[in-house]
């Protein structure tokens, strides 16, 4: 089905052609009222040629306005055929019909149908905006049309500042903006005084003389008498179609109406429409300042909450970490060698169990544990895995804060008697035994040594358990004496008592080890796990509080949707006017969506500004620490504002785009 309309072809082929410009064949229009069907038009046959001046006359309720709406593609026939220069309108979709209205027809309404918040020039420009005409071109054309119609001194006047006759002339200029090959005038003098009515009729006759096809819809025989052809409608039927004496005069040579210029390329036109949507949205928003402010209030509160909570959380984290940094970490490791990566470390065998015993005697040390390790082959039945064997003391799990999911750890007594017992990490237990088998009490081979599993660590991630390595632990004495055959240690892990300055303890440990060894053949590593935990906790708390604040954003978004739905209802007639002059459904949807996004973005900007103001006041009353704002939180706030505008503005925008232009124009 062909959905495109070649407007230029319509202009060209309609000139000096015997083919009717507009043809209705057996057109009927009916409406449902409850269970009853009312037929407004009945089997209408009508042909109108290019350059004609036609009057459709009839009493109120005769169906003449419905006939005009069908002729102008504002309405559709329930039955029959309507062709515009041979193009069947039933084959056209909504966008193609909008293109016909925009580029081919010009409407003049009895009630003018001007947008009250726009001046005369902007009202006239509307059809050209939807045609994608460049701003300068359409502005100049609008001014020229208004000046031609005697409104050169009223270009910046709004409808409320003009008389009825002046408003009607603005409506005529709007009808001519895109060329207006066919002018459809619905009771053009009905709301005017006699003098203004005559002026409007004189203008319409001049347009006819210039080659425009003019169709008047009226109930006044005096107005109809100006036409060269009068069609009388009664009860939905054409009861007469006659020529007047004026047809003896030579008909004007039909000239194509001059459009404002070639339309720009599609991309430029789309960008132009998007820019104009922003301009129109801005005008609409500032025209209702209080409503706009109330609409964005929820967004302002939500954005202020999110940004402020993020800043407070970051400030609190830095404040706490600053205190922790003054204490240091609570775990210190001692290794052989000068530093990490020392090639001589493997040959140094001076870390001994006696060093561990000496460290455990220090009052500022909570516990110290020896550590030896090696990668070993571990077997259970027919399952073999490579795992890291760690020979440690019973205090190791306390030092490293490793929790058990099942079983127990080995005791000092197990260590003294070199008990063949092991504790497995969660991953090792899963690999060896699989699901459904209780590892506790099972016997496995560590190298060639059979060992009984007495415990399994939890699946909780621990800094000291490598996530990509299988681990198991046995008493140091067992590992050194029965598996590895070594007396020296790989490392010593020390846990500092709570409240003790970690850095000072580290220095005491170095002094003790230097005294015992006589040379510095070791190095220490102070792990600040507490600091990392605080950072993680701080991030989690900030996220939690931010999620709570997001609820206010959602509430604000619902408020935006509610107000936008009300706005659609209040501006129904405006939507009908825009559709009548050629706006597509996508144009209407885009405008209301842009309005919603603009409301949310403005609310976001104000909310961020308020957050910084709160931060300034915060520093005046809280001296210990301050709110810390980040670029990420600001960018996130803007992103949230945009997303909320799109999500909660879509439904109102869709509802606006789905309005029927006839019903919309009929709204007060």
UniProtKB/Swiss-Prot annotation:
Transmembrane segments: 267-287, 293-313, 541-561, 602-622, 631-651
Any single GO CC term annotated in Swiss-Prot or TrEMBL for this entry: plasma membrane
Annotated Gene3D superfamilies: P-loop containing nucleotide triphosphate hydrolases (3.40.50.300)
EC number(s) recorded for this UniProt protein: 7.6.2.-
SMART domains: AAA
Keywords for this protein: ATP-binding, Cell inner membrane, Cell membrane, Membrane, Nucleotide-binding, Translocase, Transmembrane, Transmembrane helix, Transport
Positions annotated to bind ATP: 58-65
GO molecular function: ATP binding; ATP hydrolysis activity; transmembrane transporter activity
Amino acid composition bias (Low complexity), ranges on this chain: 245-256
Broad class of where this protein is predominantly found: membrane
Residue intervals of the ABC transporter domain: 22-260
Subcellular location as annotated: Cell inner membrane
Keyword Nucleotide-binding: yes
Family according to the record: Belongs to the ABC transporter superfamily. Macrolide exporter (TC 3.A.1.122) family.
Free-text function comment from the UniProt entry: Probably involved in the export of syringafactins.
The protein's assembly and partners: Probably part of a tripartite efflux system, which is composed of an inner membrane transporter, a periplasmic membrane fusion protein, and an outer membrane component.
Name of the molecule in the record: Probable syringafactin export ATP-binding/permease protein SyfD
Organism encoding this protein: Pseudomonas syringae pv. tomato (strain ATCC BAA-871 / DC3000)
Gene: syfD
